[in-house]
Amino acid sequence: MAEGENSVFFETFNRNKRSLSLNLNSESGRRVFEDLVRSSDAVYSNLRGDVPAKMRIRYDDLKHLNPAIVCCSLSGFGMTGPRATDPGYDYILQGIAGWMSLTGDPDGPPTKSGLSMVDYSGGFVAAISLLAGLHAARRDGVGGDCDVSLFDSAVTMLTYVAAWQMNSDFVPARMRNSSHPSLVPFQNFEAADGWFVVACAKEKFWERLVEAIGHEELAESEDYRTFSDRRVNREELLSRLNAIFIEKPVSHWL
């Protein structure tokens, strides 16, 4: 990066955006900001949950300037509650929300995902919330606050894993080779020269798999005929598939 130029990281997220720095604690900065609010559709912030109130950028602070303004806050833990003053970062939220207890191998440590998925998902939820707020404001002429938190977004994405645990005897755990907790085979497999993924999400995919690898007898076995059968006999089936896949390179299987 040459002096005076933006980093590749910065350009990844901000290319073609225009920016303006304002000190909202100064009279001149506040005046410019309020002029912008009068002619804008939305005010978006990505700050600690208690900061929008301190900076006076919530709907109640700005509605006298523009009754239709939509104020969206994306924070770690929301603008209210016991953790509103806590900062929130992707890595921390992956741990707090339980993602790391589900990621990695069973005999390894809790592991974060390779990408900042809490940050990304929180941003998507904030964008959807903001769009809903804008739709309502254009329909009714009244804006409001959109209070979005990384924590809420991350917990929401536990979906079926959380539902299984709360409604059955299922206990979420890290699965070897990134395998699916109920679908078998649905995971990474090692070939002679690398790794690839097999994903039998439907019975017909299982039938096609055994035909493609030349082991139709697996589909005929009563031990592997259905989803339930393969789940019960997971270890035995995976051992057989591992022995088959390791014999040939990835290009052969794909």
Label the model's feature ranges.
Residues 168-175:
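Conserved ATP-binding loop and adjacent catalytic segment of the adenylate-forming AMP-binding
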Residues 7, 27-30, 34, 111, ...:
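Electropositive phosphate-/nucleotide-binding environments in soluble metabolic enzymes
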Residues 146-152, 254:
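Short, well-structured alpha-helical segments that form the helix of a local strand-helix-strand
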Residues 179, 184-254:
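Aromatic-enriched alpha-helical interface/lid elements that frame and gate functional surfaces
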Residues 1-145:
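N-terminal helix-loop segment corresponding to the beta1-alpha1 unit
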Residues 115-121, 150, 198-200:
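Short beta-strand->loop
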Residues 76-78, 150-155, 193, 201-205:
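Glycine-rich beta-alpha junction loops
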Residues 123-144, 156-168, 210-217:
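Oxidoreductase and adenylate-handling cofactor-binding alpha/beta cores
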